[in-house]
Regions:
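A short, terminal or domain-edge coil/loop segment
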Residues: 10-14, 53-60, 106-113, 241-260
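A conserved active-site cap/scaffold subdomain adjacent to cofactor or substrate pockets
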Residues: 28-137, 145-153, 157-159, 168
Length: 264
């Protein structure tokens, strides 16, 4: 049985309550957008919010979002009174941009929603009114996604400390890769990240003072399990055979995991 698309979940109660035809594109789009806003729970009510995140209250007891629908296709997003978090124009805006492709064509099996038509307005404390939504007919195609077995993977980590933490981690990576080459191991992919320096933003990371510590994170993938298992035996020796000031190896060898890939 195919799963329901997350943003489609509010559509049935809204149509049950207010009616509407299969070609009522604007109201169908409103239902999809309501679903898109609340599909990740408290992410629209203060969780994972970049805007003014320091001032969002009591995330330990965050309130989950509620949609109050209206017959005209507008709705208000709120949360239970007395709970933590915040529902505001910024929190709703950030969620609207989440997992977004073409904002003019948010394609679902029921309707194509135009996110560029959405308007937001404060509607009281922890209340945001959403209106102006427009939609158009769905396309004649449906999306198919397939999960399939695609080999094996393992990820190993070590932490290098000040002084010269990044330089040590980079040197350890060079040693590891040379060892893997000598062993004749062939990976479909190998990725090194220096967590704490540039793992998130890469070359866009600003140049600042020296990091106090850097995590070397190396992941590999291959169709052959034995190849990946051999990689896992090359991480721990770096503790004694590589650069100094290293820790983070108490968990033992990296674990080999089967890759469940996604298509397309």
């Amino acid at each position: 049985t195919a799963p329901h698309a997350e943003p489609a979940l509010p559509m049935r109660p809204l149509r049950y309550e207010f009616g509407g035809g299969e070609d009522d594109w604007n109201r169908l789009a409103a239902g999809i957008i309501a679903g898109h806003i609340i599909e990740c729970g408290a992410q629209c009510s203060g969780g994972n919010c970049l805007y003014d995140w320091r001032s969002i209250p009591n995330l330990a007891d965050v309130g989950y979002p509620i949609v109050e629908g209206r017959a005209d296709g507008t709705f208000t997003v709120t949360k239970h009174p007395g709970t933590g978090g915040r529902v505001s124009v910024p929190t709703i805006t950030e969620q609207l941009l989440y997992e977004m492709g073409d904002p003019r064509a948010y394609i679902t099996p029921d309707v194509v929603a135009d996110f560029t038509t959405i308007q937001l307005a404060d509607d009281g404390p922890d209340r945001v009114r959403v209106f102006g939504i427009q939609g158009r007919p769905a396309t004649d195609k449906l999306k198919v996604s397939i999960a399939y077995r695609s080999g094996f993977k393992a990820v190993g980590t070590l932490i290098y400390s000040w002084p010269d933490a990044l330089e040590k981690a980079q040197h350890a990576d060079r040693i590891l890769r040379e060892r893997l080459d000598r062993l004749g191991l062939s990976f479909d992919r190998i990725l090194t990240e220096f967590v704490g320096v540039s793992a998130t933003h890469g070359a866009l990371t600003p140049s600042e003072h020296e990091a106090g510590e850097v995590q070397l994170r190396v992941g590999v993938g291959a169709g052959d399990r034995a190849t990946v298992e051999r990689f896992t035996r090359e991480i721990a020796p770096l503790v004694l055979n590589g650069p100094p000031s290293v820790t983070g190896f108490a968990g033992g060898r990296p674990k080999v995991e089967e890759i469940v890939a996604y298509w397309p």
